[in-house]
Amino acid sequence: MFTLPQKEFRMTTACPGSDSIQDLPSNKGDGLERECSRKPDQKLLKFYGVGDPAAELSSSSPYLSSRGSVIKWFWDSAEEGYRTYHMDEYDEDKNPSGIINLGTSENKLCFDLLSRRLSQSDMLQVEPALLQYPDWRGHLFLREEVARFLSFYCRSPAPLKPENVVVLNGCASLFSALATVLCEAGEAFLIPAPYYGAITQHVYLYGNVRLVCVYLDSEVTGLETRPFQLTVEKLEMALQGANSEGVKVKGLILINPQNPLGDIYSPGELQEYLEFAKRHELHVMVDEVYMLSVFEESAGYRSVLSLERLPDPQRTHVMWATSKDFGMSGLRFGTLYTENWAVATAVASLCRYHGLSGLVQYQMAQLLRDHDWINQVYLPENHARLKAAHTYVSEDLRALGIPFVSRGAGFFIWVDLRKYLPEATFEEEVLLWRRFLENKVLLSFGKAFECKEPGWFRLVFSDKTHRLHLGMQRVRQVLEGQPQLADGAPPHQIQEPQGPHR
């Protein structure tokens, strides 16, 4: 049960079962991809009674409310690795022995292209309207461009409508806003796990909403299955488990392409998940923040907005942002597309606290309307660089005999290091993570994504070759000094793009 922190709960050695409700927020990150960093000897705080002001913290401040203490606890529990990295960040000239960051999912490959485009004269206009309060949904000129952009790149059957667009400062705010307007305090969303762990905080810190994990595993049971595959049967089991524990589930979160797996849901799978949600009157939030970062054409990505007929359009809400696809995680632009006017209006009300400046809105409109630059310059070069970086890292992993999951989308490879754990526990996983950090390379460990199998790590490859080379060299040094179990993972767990999987 996902509840408020209480004192002195030590890390468990195994995840709950496949229909369990999330029990640990262990190191979920702070919404800026810092999900890989809790101290291994830090005691976890037992969660109980979501929203219960009587919940106790092992260390609370006399200056904070109980809610404030919980919020501070999330920050404190997820900062160590990221803070360590920033105190000793690698710099080729100033700090060549510093930490290489292969843990934060950012695209660092195309700054040259972005810098030139964002510095052009058409980006620098200032008008009185841009310095005044906007429509909180976003300026109409931006919402019109977002609708045209999504219509084109999501391949929607009919043009999308600007009145269904809401603009916020990133997908973290969108998750938070949707959780707040769709759920009562203590209600929950289903989410396939492993998943991007910062979503835990996005839906909880304001909305007081839980996550019910639909736990996936690496086992492959036949020719038509793949590692960590989501099925309707698993969704049904998780929903039944939540109901049996008295937890009201209001929605389903899907990330497509998936983070941390890099997996892609086929149109048939998406249709099945949406029909499951309709049967149970669940909202579906689809995060498509990596939709233009599919660098293998054979991966066969399709947006949910490309489906001819949504089973329940009033409960289907789609998110996208520029942080990943355009390498602008510091610029903070995200958008919601929903046909539900009540949901759009409620989320827009929260844009008072999560809106964009008029100048940023203008720049985003200019960028999104420039299809010539996007199609002829940026996307081809970005995909080529992502593919080259992925090839470099995957070849290193093969040389080390390390299985991995990767389907040609996103910035990361899901790496199987289970054979390097003396015991199959999350304590050993964190100890291995710390050895990487001590050897000046930062990765993200599986428990940060609520993976139920100890020993999986997310490795980000979307960086320059010289940093990848040094980072992989440091990974190799750690693993070569680590004893291995006699039997590694079976070869069928290596999953790479070889054509559509459906």
From Swiss-Prot:
One of its GO terms (biological process) is biosynthetic process. GO terms for molecular function: pyridoxal phosphate binding; transaminase activity. SUPFAM superfamilies: PLP-dependent transferases. Keywords: Pyridoxal phosphate. Residues 15-35 are annotated as: Disordered. Pfam families: Aminotran_1_2. The modification N6-(pyridoxal phosphate)lysine is found at residue 324. Substrate binds at residue 106. Belongs to the class-I pyridoxal-phosphate-dependent aminotransferase family. Does not catalyze the synthesis of 1-aminocyclopropane-1-carboxylate but is capable of catalyzing the deamination of L-vinylglycine. This is 1-aminocyclopropane-1-carboxylate synthase-like protein 1. It comes from Bos taurus. The lineage of its organism: Eukaryota, Metazoa, Chordata, Craniata, Vertebrata.
